[in-house]
Amino acid sequence: MTAIIELNNLSVQFHQKGRLVTAVKNATLHIEKGDIYGVIGYSGAGKSTLVRTINLLQKPTEGQIVINGEKIFDSANPVKFTGAKLREFRQKIGMIFQHFNLLSEKTVFNNVAFALQHSQIEDKNGKKRYLTKKEKNDKVTELLKLVDLADLSDKYPAQLSGGQKQRVAIARALTNDPEILISDEGTSALDPKTTNQILDLLKSLHEKLGITVVLITHEMQVVKEIANKVAVMQNGEIIEQNSLIDIFAQPKEALTKQFIETTSSVNRFIASLSKTELLAQLADDEELIHLDYSGSELEDPVVSDITKKFDVTTNIFYGNVELLQGQPFGSLVLTLKGSSEHRAAAKAYFVERHLKFEVLGKIERTVD
């Protein structure tokens, strides 16, 4: 597919307290039309700065930006992109934030309508005109239905929950029919249940409207829920980017692995083993194995195969299967018991089958 967002070799620098700070360094990111693209990193990684260059809320120092085939910034060959042209361009990019930024003295309906006060459309002769009052009202009514707030249109922000406030913000961000929706930590202020509801809404809007979503977050669980692609940022640089499935199946960078571990129940289980009395120390002919597998591998009886082929026995302590982008991913923690030669043959079989595994070793009980 064609990239709707192209950020090429972008750097962003600014002066802070007498010193030059590089917030983004030589970052390249291409986002295709229809992606839900997660950009993840810890606080200060540069993810918000990078993504705010998409609509030029943050002007880069170096590099090139192409949005929907139109070059809007090029440090090597400056582009004149200001005034009315810039305002019109920004209307096609909606944004939501961690803080909802609603007008407290206006109702839900009027908070959304406020974003339409300068909106224009083309008439049948190709001339631009402002929306009529009826057109604005119809648009707001349609959007409130879309975000499931039709029955709260007369309420004020103080009467809403956090999730409802964010739904108002989303409706407001959609008023000018944007092709791109940026969520800058849009779920960070919400509890887990409400977070999932907002993520479900974003996914639904993506499907209904065909909108491209850019999701900035410090939580891998948020990315895991709805994104199809991921970029990981650290110290202003994109250190890894790939499809969600490939990131989870074969993470390359230590930071990426750390983020993935925060979403994995198998890692919590492994950590708990050192504090449990369920397992004594392993025998000399036993090893504890953590095995990951995905897709068609889940259909194959791998554990059964190794017990038959290599004269080893197994004892499964943990098993889990979940779906990522509709593809199953599974984890097992099991003991492998047998002679060193037979255990080595079983592990070689894992390698042959392209299964990801690690030897966890013996369990040593620890005390808190």
UniProtKB/Swiss-Prot annotation:
UniProt key word Hydrolase: no
Residue stretches making up the ABC transporter domain: 5-260
GO CC annotation terms, alphabetical: plasma membrane
A Pfam family the protein falls into: ABC_tran
Upper lineage: Bacteria, Bacillati, Bacillota, Bacilli, Lactobacillales
Coiled coil: none
Membrane topology: Peripheral membrane protein
Residues where ATP binds: G41, Y42, S43, G44, A45, G46, K47, S48
Keywords associated with the record: Amino-acid transport, ATP-binding, Cell membrane, Membrane, Nucleotide-binding, Translocase, Transport
Described purpose of this protein according to its UniProt entry: Part of the ABC transporter complex MetNIQ involved in methionine import. Responsible for energy coupling to the transport system.
Assembly notes: The complex is composed of two ATP-binding proteins (MetN), two transmembrane proteins (MetI) and a solute-binding protein (MetQ).
GO MF annotations, alphabetized: ABC-type D-methionine transporter activity; ATP binding; ATP hydrolysis activity
Catalytic activity: L-methionine(out) + ATP + H2O = L-methionine(in) + ADP + phosphate + H(+); D-methionine(out) + ATP + H2O = D-methionine(in) + ADP + phosphate + H(+)
Protein name, UniProt field: Methionine import ATP-binding protein MetN
EC number: 7.4.2.11
Top-rank taxon: Bacteria
Family of the protein in this entry: Belongs to the ABC transporter superfamily. Methionine importer (TC 3.A.1.24) family.
Cell compartments where the protein resides: Cell membrane
InterPro entries membership: AAA+_ATPase, ABC_transporter-like_ATP-bd, ABC_transporter-like_CS, ACT-like_dom_sf, MetN_ABC, MetN_ABC_transporter-like, NIL_domain, P-loop_NTPase
Species of the source: Lactococcus lactis subsp. cremoris (strain SK11)
